[in-house]
């Protein structure tokens, strides 16, 4: 992606997802007003980033997809900064959570007031549940301000970095009900 001018693999992924939405909307059997996304881990934060960049996404499910940068692996942003994700986290911001130009609470707020389902396992060793809670708490006032104070649903299963079947089924039901 870098030879094509993208500053990160993440931005290239966002572009690919936006183009996928363009294609979906060109199909006669797709209702472009009822598009939802769902993703786990890398797919979980890709779902958030796509929704932040493209308002055609009406509902979002993110599973094990984010935490505050300070709570991500104890503040060690190495996992975020490798070449396949966002290398500028290392080269520009020195992998320092305090120097990051954004926080995931702001990504959630950018999605508001669209409906958001979060799977945040209690024992996720990558995306710390306390950091997830802090991001959600910071975004909720924006949801309330925009008229959807109950727009974020969070599930806290008793597991590690996983999207357990019962939470996945709850997400599918929620997507179906919310998009109707």
What kind of feature is each model-predicted range?
Residues 1-26, 73-74:
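Cap/lid segment of the alpha/beta-hydrolase catalytic domain
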Residues 29-41:
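Alpha/beta-hydrolase fold nucleophile elbow
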Residues 38, 63-64, 119, 157:
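Alpha/beta-hydrolase-fold catalytic nucleophile elbow
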Residues 46-89:
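Hydrolase active-site cap/lid region
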Residues 73-128:
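The feature captures the conserved acid-bearing segment of alpha/beta-hydrolase catalytic domains
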Residues 123-133, 161-162:
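Acidic catalytic loop of the alpha/beta-hydrolase fold
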Residues 136-180:
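C-terminal catalytic histidine-bearing segment of alpha/beta-hydrolase fold enzymes
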């Amino acid at each position: 992606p870098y030879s094509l001018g993208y500053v990160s693999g993440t931005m290239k992924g966002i572009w690919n997802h936006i183009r996928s939405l363009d294609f979906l909307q060109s199909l006669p059997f797709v209702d472009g007003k009822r598009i939802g996304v769902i993703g786990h881990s890398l797919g979980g934060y890709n779902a958030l980033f796509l929704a932040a960049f493209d308002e055609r996404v009406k509902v979002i499910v993110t599973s094990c997809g984010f935490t505050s940068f300070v709570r991500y692996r104890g503040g060690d942003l190495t996992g975020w900064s490798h070449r396949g994700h966002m290398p500028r986290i290392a080269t520009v911001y020195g992998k320092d959570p305090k120097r990051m130009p954004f926080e995931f609470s702001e990504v959630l707020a950018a999605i508001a007031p669209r409906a958001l389902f979060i799977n945040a396992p209690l024992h996720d060793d990558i995306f710390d549940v306390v950091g997830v809670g802090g991001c959600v708490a910071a975004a909720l006032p924006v949801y309330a301000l925009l008229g959807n104070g109950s727009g974020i649903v969070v599930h806290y299963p008793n597991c590690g970095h996983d999207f357990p079947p019962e939470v996945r089924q709850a997400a599918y039901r929620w997507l179906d009900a919310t998009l109707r």
